[in-house]
């Protein structure tokens, strides 16, 4: 009895600290949201810095183990919610008319980015080829959270918003099989691992599950006046969130498909068959998405230490700089060659490939496995994410406004030339 009282007191203290931090950061985020919209300040950067200051690298108030199942599961929940929201944003009209740009980036730019990162990592850091390709796979996806300032700006041309949104949503799920396959190859018993069967099963089951559950959810949801009569407004967003998590759960059950791809495909299917769901989700579920985003970035920040981030010295800085400034931009420019896309659009999409939740989640999954170089790979990925949060956070709002002004100036230029 005596031993349980200190344990209960410690648990209560930890819960009190967690609620204090969560409440304080929610208030801070709300107060700074207007400032962030008018300046280069990124709320994501604020939350990560707050997590770092409160974590082991700072005051030590937040103490999370990177190998804790809680951390990996929180990141996974964040991906499910965010991918589902982004999938609902995919419009059928744009999917039919403008599929070629995101497809080229997924099929060409993504693997080329991973290859370039792997080559430089092998040369500068000295990881094995498999470990280097694992880091390349971790850094190949872009982040739907950090892309939100662009894809939610209605003044930015729809083709750019659609391309970035579809790319950032799909490449999270597409990168996961490669991450897990390479992790398994580095682990024990890798001699019995057949990678192509693994990838085929993950992709196939995930895709089919997403299509079937999305179609079923669209059919179950009442239509027209019956919908308003039988389902209150707040229950419609709960229906959508429930569909997201149910899809993930079904997909990862035997025969074990890719739950993230299933969630995104389900959201696309549901959004196309029932466009009204998109409005319900935007009106009621955005607060949940924001809280999940806040939580994952604060936890991520609390796991960072200066010693870990710069454990590889200047080689780590060089790998991160190459990834953000050369690997992604070069890969996208190669992928978009011959598409007829203007130079400004190519340049913006080449630069805007932020690293965030997906890379964090996958790095945490790698760290939780018995991989000798797991900590080194995690810290390199973490430094890339932190640098990307700052760099892309500083440029997302100014960049989207520049694109918007440029797009709005085009019709006036055409009218002026016609009048002349």
Stretches with model-predicted labels:
Residues 1-420:
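Transmembrane helical cores of multi-pass secondary ion antiporters/exchangers
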């Amino acid at each position: 009895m005596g031993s349980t009282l200190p344990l209960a007191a410690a648990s209560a203290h930890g819960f009190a600290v967690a609620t204090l931090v969560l409440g304080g950061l929610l208030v801070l985020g709300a107060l700074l949201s207007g400032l962030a919209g008018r300046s280069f300040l990124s709320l994501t950067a604020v939350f990560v810095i707050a997590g770092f200051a409160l974590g082991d690298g700072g005051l030590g108030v937040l103490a999370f183990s990177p190998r804790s199942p809680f951390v990996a599961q929180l990141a996974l929940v964040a991906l499910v919610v965010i991918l589902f929201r982004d999938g609902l944003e995919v419009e059928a009209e744009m999917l039919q008319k403008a599929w070629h740009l995101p497809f080229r980036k997924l099929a060409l730019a993504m693997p080329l980015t991973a290859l370039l990162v792997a080559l430089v990592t092998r040369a500068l850091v000295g990881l094995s080829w498999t470990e280097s390709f694992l880091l390349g796979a971790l850094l190949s996806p872009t982040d739907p959270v950090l892309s939100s300032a662009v894809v939610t700006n209605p003044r930015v041309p729809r083709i750019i918003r659609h391309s970035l949104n579809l790319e950032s949503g799909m490449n999270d799920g597409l990168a996961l099989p490669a991450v897990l396959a390479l992790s398994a190859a580095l682990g024990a018993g890798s001699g019995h691992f057949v990678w192509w069967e693994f990838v085929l099963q993950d992709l196939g089951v995930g895709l089919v599950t997403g299509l079937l559950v999305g179609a079923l959810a669209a059919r179950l949801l009442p239509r027209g006046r019956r919908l308003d009569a039988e389902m209150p407004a707040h229950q419609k967003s709960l229906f959508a969130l429930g569909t997201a998590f149910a899809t993930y759960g079904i997909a990862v059950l035997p025969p074990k498909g890719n739950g993230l791809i299933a969630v995104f495909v389900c959201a696309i299917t549901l959004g196309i068959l029932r466009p009204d769901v998109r409005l319900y989700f935007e009106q009621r579920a955005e607060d949940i998405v924001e809280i999940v985003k806040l939580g994952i970035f604060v936890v991520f920040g609390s796991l960072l230490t200066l010693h870990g981030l710069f454990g590889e010295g200047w080689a780590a800085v060089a790998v991160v700089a190459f990834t953000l400034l050369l690997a992604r931009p070069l890969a996208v420019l190669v992928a978009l060659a011959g598409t007829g896309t203007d130079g400004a659009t190519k340049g913006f999409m080449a630069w805007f490939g932020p690293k965030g939740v997906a890379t964090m989640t996958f790095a945490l999954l790698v760290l939780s496995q018995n991989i000798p170089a797991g900590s080194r790979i995690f810290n390199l990925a973490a430094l890339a994410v932190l640098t990307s949060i700052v760099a892309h956070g500083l440029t997302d709002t100014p960049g989207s406004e520049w694109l918007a002004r440029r797009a709005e100036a085009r019709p006036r230029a055409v009218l002026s030339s016609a009048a002349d």
